[in-house]
């Protein structure tokens, strides 16, 4: 039994459009730690989806993840956003960590367990305004767009091979 290329071609729009409705952190559980039961957090005004995470990912590399290098890179990235990250009324911290883990594929809790400087958290007084605060985005191919191009190419190949 042979599958018609036209059948595959008719399924292409379904696959292409299904990726547009899901976001990366839609399936992440965002636990409300140290919050009142009915207190809601506001959406973060900072656009962490388009920040330049190469500040962290180019310096903090496994498998050993050296604490001094990783914590320094993390501070260089996060300190310019310290005010919004420390505000417990928004979801900026959880959003930022979701993207750090997405782009860097770090073990869960690596920065929280490794980077400790005192009771008040990390000291950002010695960190200068870094590129993360000034350059909002780096060019990244969207996963959905990449899948769309790839699946279109495969369907076209099947059409040409079957004719």
UniProtKB/Swiss-Prot annotation:
One GO BP annotation of this record: negative regulation of reactive oxygen species biosynthetic process
Species for this entry: Arabidopsis thaliana (Mouse-ear cress)
InterPro entries xref list: LORELEI-like (IPR039307)
Entry GO CC: plasma membrane; pollen tube; side of membrane
Tissue: Expressed in pollen, pollen tubes, sporophytic pistil tissues, in the early stages of female gametophyte development, and in unfertilized, mature ovules.
Positions annotated with a glycan in the UniProt record: 52
Signal peptide (UniProt feature, chain positions): 1-23
The gene coding this protein: LLG2
Annotated compartments: Cell membrane
Keywords: Cell membrane, Glycoprotein, GPI-anchor, Lipoprotein, Membrane, Signal
Deletion consequences: No aborted seed phenotype and normal production of seed sets.
Highest taxon in the source lineage: Eukaryota
Name of the protein: GPI-anchored protein LLG2
Chief location category: membrane
Protein topology in the membrane: Lipid-anchor; GPI-anchor
């Amino acid at each position: 039994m042979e599958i018609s290329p036209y059948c595959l071609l008719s399924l292409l729009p379904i696959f292409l459009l299904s990726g547009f409705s899901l976001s990366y952190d839609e399936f992440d559980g965002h636990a409300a730690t140290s919050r009142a039961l009915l207190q809601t957090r506001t959406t973060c005004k900072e656009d962490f989806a388009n920040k330049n995470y190469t500040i962290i990912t180019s310096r903090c590399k496994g498998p050993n993840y050296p604490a001094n290098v990783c914590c320094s890179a993390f501070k260089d990235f996060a300190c310019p956003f310290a005010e919004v990250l420390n505000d417990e009324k928004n979801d900026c911290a959880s959003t930022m960590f979701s993207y750090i883990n997405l782009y860097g594929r770090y073990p869960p809790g690596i920065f929280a367990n490794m980077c400790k400087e005192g009771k008040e958290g990390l000291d950002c007084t010695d960190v200068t305004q870094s590129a993360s605060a000034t350059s909002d985005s780096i060019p990244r191919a969207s996963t959905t767009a990449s899948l769309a191009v790839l699946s279109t190419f495969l369907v076209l190949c099947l059409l040409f091979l079957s004719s």
